Amino acid sequence: MKPDSKRNLFIMWFANFFVAGSMTMVLPFISLYIETFGNFSATYVQHWSGWTFAITFVAAFLFSPIWGRIGDLYGRKKILIASGLGMGLSIFLMGYVTSVWQLFMLRLFMGIFTGFIPMSQAFISTQTPKNIAGKVMGTLQTGSITGSLMGPMLGGILADQFGFAHTFKWTSISIFLSALLVLFTREIILQNKDDKITSYSSKAVILHIIRHPILLTVLLISALIQVAHFSIQPILSLYVSKLHGSENLAFFAGIAFSAGGLGNLMMARQWGKIADRYGYIKILIILLFMAGLFYLPGGFVTNYWQLVIIRFTLGVTIGGIIPVRIAYIRQEAPIAMQGEVLGYNTSLRFFGNIIGPVMGGLISGYFGFSAVFVTTSLLLILSGLILLLAMNRHTQVAGINLEKKRMPL
């Protein structure tokens, strides 16, 4: 990488650290925050936790391709700054809400600007040589993972000591800081000498995706993966309450969230390097099967620390899925359309984020927590099977020639 690109990676690592840390500071106790608005039944809280999670991603699902295209045309740096400011403002105002509807509407507003981390991936991806894309994207992800690791525990401590409202205010300050950091980056686009087209119409981008069946499959299973991953998020703190009790609940829920982040942090960069060497699709299939197998025991634990251990082992596998997926898109999509392709990828991920929390809330409300883990496990294994079948059916398209991959741009 060029010196300016390395500097950008360094800055965006810290920006992602602050954004991810800030977002996960409040995620573990959204359901607990809703409980403070009135005397509600457990089923009511579980259902509204799911809807409040999901509404952010409804807006993000609609706006992600738009932001991606704007980024391709006018620069991703501007989009990153707007995203940070929009998220920071909405989270700041969440500290003043008095009803679940007010929280719901602010989460909707936040969704319009959500996408800082995916946009930062596009920002760095376009200035990264293809042969090291997995390692670089894995390195970038360690920033958000480290933030995610520290965020829940810090959020739990702040919530227990100062209350939920003050935690939202501190969270917004961190996100505003991330937007400020972006000002010190320099936008660079590493053009391939074979890429003569400098811009593509939306129709051309969609046709490119359709004509590359493995790329299309990777984008589509992004939704399934997120359905699986986010189905547990809204009810994890309630599950911790069942296993551990209500004492210092926000703190212990934060630890459960962070355990997955620790495993993720340890392996994200390593999975990227492995995929650079052996092929992104093959490693992605392996990771999906492993994640499915590791998720299953979570529904049958009998104490809190068993859940923490399982969350850690799950994080080891989940850590590679996003950087490997982004690196594959970097390889298959021309630079001039990468923002929009990644926008569709992000949009489908957010679509999964819409379905996942609602599904998790409904399943846990009617069938119990264990059923959520079983469903999640099956969805991840199904995603791996779909990608495996697609790879076998389109071998020539899916094949990743190491010599081709290692050619410098």
Each PLM stretch: what is its role?
Residues 78-93, 172, 282-297:
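Structural signature of the two symmetry-related core transmembrane helices
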Residues 90, 101-109, 294, 305-313:
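Paired small-residue
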Residues 61-98, 275-278:
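Conserved MFS/SLC helix-loop-helix module at the cytosolic interface between two early adjacent transmembrane helices
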Residues 51-67, 258-269:
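Central cavity-lining transmembrane alpha-helices of secondary-active solute carriers
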Residues 1-6, 188-219, 403-409:
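Juxtamembrane intracellular "pre-TM" segments in multi-pass secondary transporters
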Residues 106-144, 327-328:
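Cytoplasmic helix-loop-helix junction between adjacent transmembrane helices
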Residues 167-183, 373-389:
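Symmetry-related core transmembrane helices of the 12-TM Major Facilitator Superfamily/SLC fold
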Residues 29-46, 235-251:
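Short amphipathic helix-loop junctions that connect adjacent transmembrane helices
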